[in-house]
């Protein structure tokens, strides 16, 4: 509704829970929402916490930094559409070839031709997660933030910038 009734405001998911949907589902949702909003969509992602991940989604809450890294990498590969998706990581194996696999999964490429630069923001509270956001993402979503301590967050994010080719300026992050 907002996308159809506005033409300047940026629209996005506050934090789409990573355990609640596959990276492909998140990427296709982002591409569709970006198209419907005229290129104004921001994909916000986060892992949530162990209470929700294990209690609601029935998944172990282990290695959240690895989970976020792989998820963002996969989403970017899908929206960039450079080649069919192949990812063999610790959290995701795409196409799946593990126990119970039929062997029929093949590398796929999205048929959606969207904006390959959809911004990805991540919800990150811990210092290492904020550093990872600076490395991998286009912005940071803070659910609890002390406005008297922005230098704390800035220094964490800037450590991530040192590992990234994407960003170097905190003022545009």
Positions of PLM-derived features:
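Active-site-adjacent structural elements that line small-molecule/cofactor binding pockets in enzymes
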Residues: 1-173
